[in-house]
Amino acid sequence: MKPIYEENEETLEIAEQISCHIPPHLHKSMELVSVTEGTLEIGVGTELYHMEKGDFALVFPELIHHYQVFNSESCKAIYALASPLLAPSYTKELQQFCPVNPVILAQEVLPDVNYALRSMLVYPAASQGHVLHQAFIQIILARTLPLFEMIDNSSVGSNDIIYQTVSYFAAHYTEELTLSKMAHDLGISQSSLSRVFSGTFH
């Protein structure tokens, strides 16, 4: 099973790659997504949002999210995991809020955003790259955050078992976990929890 809680030590990871189904997960980084071919579905919390070529999405840190590809044709996107440390002037927004809808439609995405994403693909994550990456992330946030309607991030939750499972992993990822302990702590049966693992996190 692939990890569903990721603690990214790197400041920035970015790649353009073929999109695929990615099960629910969360991490301390913000995730930036720009569809370059085809279509993609991004789920944040319990909501699913459709993305087409040119659309941009921003997933704030510590929010459970996943990806699905329903298009039979190729789908590619630029995916970036960026530490909030790259955007110190936006710390409060990134920690306390999140967009009602994380997707900005292609026609509303400003050219600066695409330029910054493409530029980060070019510059290596070396010492001079870090300064450039910080500048590019600041540009992206400065140009996209005003386009979002924000809500308190504590309101993006759910009592559903998948959400509870991922949240549990996030809170206890440094501990040794067993199916019986986790089921007990979540107040569900071991067989129900086992079905979540086999059906969702395969």
Q: Which residues does each PLM region occupy?
A:
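A hydrophobic/aromatic-rich effector-binding and dimerization subdomain
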Residues: 1-15, 59-128, 141-150
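Basic/polar phosphate-binding segments, predominantly the helix-turn-helix DNA-binding elements
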Residues: 176-202
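All-alpha amphipathic helical-bundle segments outside canonical DNA-binding/catalytic cores
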Residues: 123-139, 156-159
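Solvent-exposed, amphipathic alpha-helical segments
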Residues: 38, 112-126, 161-172
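Generic detection of well-ordered alpha-helical segments
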Residues: 138, 142, 160-163, 167, ...
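Generic protein-terminus/edge-of-domain signal
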Residues: 1-56, 63, 71
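A short, Lys/Arg-enriched amphipathic alpha-helix from helix-turn-helix/homeodomain DNA-binding modules
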Residues: 110, 153-177, 181-186
